[in-house]
């Protein structure tokens, strides 16, 4: 049994050693991928019968807890950290840095919220407000996201740019990002465009908790730029920062008054720890 799972644990161990910090969602995804790529047909069913449970969950527990180890070759990532509302697991002998947590958060955000997932929601919203999409494209955030750590483990992240036009004086350049956490890097100059518009909008997905939004609001000034939050499952948009001049946009938000009240409450009542 250990021999059969050895390639799986080797693959997962190499990944853990490379990054040191992995989100729960990404770890579960890598476990699934390793089982699909390393086990032959019939091996998984036989192992699950022998072990009395689903392999994905058994391997996840083997990696992230001290109990129920399936093999001495199982990676050990029992150190658990909550960062910005997401759960992360770290190697116990690894002195993680804040940059590694940030990179792990960005990796998972890009996996679970690719910009394409939100594009149709945004396009439908703009059409309802009377706009036509005249230009769109995928652009890269070509930069070292996390300094020296990211130079060693470089990732390329994409965002989508839309140019929506309603009339000669109503046109918007809209950028769709995988997370609010990417916006500071865009603001630093890595997402410049030749497209000129009278207003900029950044659309980001919802998060598990308000923490990433509160951190962003407290640490960054976006000037005249608006930020909208998209709920992919409900196919809705609501404002986070800024008030649109076009009443047709305002009237198509799902619940703008409630969204703005929530932002006000977050700012007054919640404290975000520094990492």
Where are these regions (language model features)?
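A sequence-composition feature that detects small, non-aromatic residues
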Residues: 16-17, 99, 104, 110, ...
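Conserved mixed alpha/beta catalytic, RNA-binding, or beta-rich assembly cores of soluble enzyme
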Residues: 188-189
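Charged, structured surface patches that assemble and position nucleic-acid processing machinery
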Residues: 154-156, 171-173, 178-183, 192-275
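Acidic-basic catalytic patches of nuclease active cores, encompassing PD-(D/E)XK
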Residues: 2-20, 25-71, 75-86, 91-159, ...
